[in-house]
């Protein structure tokens, strides 16, 4: 047995999650097998953020500190063999950001203890990481309870000489959600052509922006649901549900190096059309009476009014006039519904949309219509760095503090819109454990 048999930090009541502005109390525990002369015993509470240009590289190129406080627990002397406890207490700053860890950077809060020994003797050090969770109240975000709507019109040619257009409109019932809540999606597709469209796909995306020497964008697909295509000259309506899994909150107030955004992207490949809805993920839910999950088939649940061009181009108007007249919207069925498995390191297939990254000098735009995205399913994390030739896949999974990871992760997708209606209208938006 050595001279120092035990040297560790213990926090009061075994806590590991704290809120900004709270006191953090604990003690340094020391067990000695022989007398230990020392010059000083110190404890430090610190919080910082570091960002790297390379994935899983601890050599930070940019750092910022949030707090760094030290206490002297004992001055020069000698400790006899046996157990020794040195209590301490710090007050966490009210502006401390939420803990976060990703492949290109992290926000870490920790307590470090050290024993400075006389010259030619080995110093002793230990540390303990704790988590800070600064709850995001979604009700503090303006218009958070309002429906989220976006629309696009795509004009295209087919059969060499014919032209047509597709109007894609997507909406969600809210602009912000909490873990375990159901996101209700509605998409209206008006096919003003004689050609069938490809399937419509909705993806819940997470975009983490890291400010190193240049902005690095880490984008992953959290969940994806696919519906069928729309027949020629038809107006279709697609309604689906996505269960919000355990995710870090939107933004990271107090941190200027890492920013988190969420988007719901609804797209079709043929014709190529995409709409992107910015979303917020928070910790305190929106104060709103839940909407009915089962509006009548073909009827609008009040989420949106389909956007149709009031004055289409002449050739498009002629094409519409020559084609069949639109009837009431038909309901699209769902082909597949997938949710990312937790902390998986298996690489998924990557479908790349090559987009040149935009040079950004300030903070990344929170409501950009289309961030530089590369879509993937599963744990593959592609990213774009300025000047890079394309996306680079990584296998790092986001490390969530215990407050997040304690939620029941949805291994299975939530019921589809049709299934939820068939179950008698039971609300599936309950938080796990409630």
Swiss-Prot record:
An annotated GO BP: extracellular transport
GO CC terms of this entry: cytoplasm; cytoplasmic vesicle; extracellular vesicle; plasma membrane
Post-translational modification: Ubiquitinated. Ubiquitination by WWP2; promotes localization to extracellular microvesicles. Ubiquitinated by WWP1.
Compartment annotation: Cell membrane
Superkingdom field: Eukaryota
Pfam families per record: Arrestin_C (PF02752), Arrestin_N (PF00339)
Molecular functions per Gene Ontology: arrestin family protein binding; identical protein binding; ubiquitin protein ligase binding; ubiquitin-like ligase-substrate adaptor activity
Motif segment (PPxY motif 2): 414-417
Family named by the database record: Belongs to the arrestin family.
Protein name, per record: Arrestin domain-containing protein 1
């Amino acid at each position: 047995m050595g001279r120092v048999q035990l040297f560790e930090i213990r926090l009061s009541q075994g806590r590991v999650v704290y809120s900004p502005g709270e006191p953090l109390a604990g003690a340094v525990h020391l067990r000695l097998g022989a007398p230990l002369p020392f010059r000083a015993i110190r404890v430090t509470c610190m919080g910082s953020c570091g960002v790297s240009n390379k994935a899983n590289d601890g050599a930070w190129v940019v750092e910022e500190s949030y707090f760094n406080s030290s206490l002297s627990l004992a001055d020069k002397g000698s400790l006899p063999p046996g157990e020794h406890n040195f209590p301490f207490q710090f007050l966490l700053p009210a502006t401390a950001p939420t803990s976060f860890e990703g492949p290109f950077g992290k926000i870490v809060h920790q307590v470090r203890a050290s024993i400075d020994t006389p010259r030619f003797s080995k110093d002793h050090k230990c540390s303990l990481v704790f988590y800070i969770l600064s709850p995001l109240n979604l009700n503090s975000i303006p218009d958070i309870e309002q429906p989220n709507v976006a629309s696009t019109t795509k004009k295209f040619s087919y059969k060499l000489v014919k032209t047509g257009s597709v109007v894609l409109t997507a909406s969600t019932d809210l602009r912000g959600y909490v873990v375990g809540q159901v996101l209700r999606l509605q998409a209206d597709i008006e096919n003003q052509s004689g050609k069938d469209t490809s399937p419509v796909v909705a993806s819940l995306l997470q975009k983490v922006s890291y400010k190193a020497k240049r902005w690095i964008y880490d984008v992953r697909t959290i969940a994806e649901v696919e519906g069928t295509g729309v027949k020629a000259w038809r107006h279709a309506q697609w309604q689906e549900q996505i269960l919000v899994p355990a995710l870090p909150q939107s933004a990271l107030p107090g941190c200027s190096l890492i920013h988190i955004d969420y988007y719901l992207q609804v797209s079709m490949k043929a014709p190529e059309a995409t709409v992107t809805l910015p979303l917020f993920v928070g910790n305190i839910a929106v104060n709103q009476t839940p909407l009915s999950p089962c509006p009548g088939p073909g009827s609008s649940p009040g989420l949106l009014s389909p956007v149709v061009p009031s004055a289409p181009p002449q050739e498009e108007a002629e094409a519409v006039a020559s084609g069949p007249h639109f009837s009431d919207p038909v309901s699209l069925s769902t082909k597949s519904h997938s949710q990312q498995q937790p902390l998986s390191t298996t690489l998924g297939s990557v479908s790349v949309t090559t987009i040149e990254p935009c040079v950004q000098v300030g903070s990344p735009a929170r409501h950009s219509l289309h961030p530089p995205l590369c879509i993937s399913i599963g744990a593959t994390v592609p990213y774009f760095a300025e000047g890079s030739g394309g996306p680079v896949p990584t296998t790092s999974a986001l490390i969530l503090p215990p407050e997040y990871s304690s939620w029941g992760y949805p291994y299975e997708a939530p019921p589809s819109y049709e299934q939820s209606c068939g179950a008698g209208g039971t609300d599936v938006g309950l938080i796990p454990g409630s």
